[in-house]
């Protein structure tokens, strides 16, 4: 039987199954694994919507990472222990209530783990040689364990953004070409029908074009835009 040791939060904060899962993930970290903290932070920023992390929570995560002295996260010393006042200053003066809300969001998203002391304070105990023997604060270990997941999500988001940009470019080029062809057709009196087929005149073509364009929503996904791009092509 596997023994599971879980750290419970101080005070009125509740312990959820998601919090337990995050602690299990943190404990599963291979001791030799190392990641560049700012590379992972950038990946999380890119994948924030997929991870359900609010924009301002990223400012708090940025501040937390700045309290870790190393650029590479590895080994056991991944707990940072700034006070809320120190965190607020690093997060550009974020109000305390907002700071606490976004810290909770980071915990709920499984990006950090709370390691609360008996009195709820954040601090570290050092040995005789000055090394940290144990600390209470926020454990950054999930960032190391889930690094590949964050990078994969960021790559998916970037690929989707590129695909959306390309389909928007297709539509822009088609709109330009169609508008110029309609203008030229009207000015030059070019016939619109070949063998009795097709729209009766350029005004009808323009109406068909307008009908396609007004169906495009202001904020559209790639899946919504691709049929329009195909129709205009």
Model-found features: residue ranges?
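Short recognition helix of helix-turn-helix/winged-helix DNA-binding domains
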Residues: 1-80, 183-203
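Short loop/turn segments at secondary-structure transitions that flank enzyme active sites
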Residues: 66, 118-120, 142-146
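Electrostatic interaction modules used in gene-expression and signaling proteins
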Residues: 179-233
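Intrinsically disordered, low-complexity acidic/Q/S/K-rich activation/interaction tracts characteristic
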Residues: 156-157, 162-191
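Extracellular structured ligand-interaction cores
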Residues: 55, 84, 109, 133-137
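Winged helix-turn-helix DNA-binding recognition segment
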Residues: 70-126
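Short, solvent-exposed positions on alpha-helices
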Residues: 55-58, 97, 223
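Short, amphipathic alpha-helical interaction segments positioned at domain boundaries
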Residues: 129-166
């Amino acid at each position: 039987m596997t023994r599971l040791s879980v750290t419970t939060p101080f005070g009125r904060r509740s312990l959820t199954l998601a919090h337990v899962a995050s602690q299990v993930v943190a404990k599963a970290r291979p001791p030799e694994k190392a990641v560049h903290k700012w590379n992972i932070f950038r990946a999380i920023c890119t994948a924030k919507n997929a991870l359900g992390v609010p924009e301002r929570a990223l400012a708090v995560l940025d501040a937390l990472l700045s309290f870790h002295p190393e650029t590479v996260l590895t080994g056991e010393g991944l707990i940072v222990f700034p006070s809320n006042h120190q965190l607020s200053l690093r997060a550009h003066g974020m109000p305390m209530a907002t700071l606490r809300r976004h810290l909770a969001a980071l915990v709920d998203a499984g990006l950090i783990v709370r390691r609360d002391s008996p009195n709820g304070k954040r601090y570290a105990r050092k040995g005789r040689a000055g090394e940290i023997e144990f600390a209470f604060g926020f454990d950054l270990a999930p960032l190391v364990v889930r690094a590949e997941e964050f990078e994969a999500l960021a790559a998916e988001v970037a690929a989707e953004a590129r695909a959306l940009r390309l389909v928007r470019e297709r539509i822009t080029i088609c709109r330009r070409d169609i508008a110029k062809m309609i203008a030229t057709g009207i000015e030059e009196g070019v016939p619109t029908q070949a063998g009795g087929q097709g729209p009766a005149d350029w005004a009808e073509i323009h109406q068909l074009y307008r009908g396609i364009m007004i169906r495009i929503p202001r904020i559209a996904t790639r899946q919504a835009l691709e049929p329009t791009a195909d129709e205009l092509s």
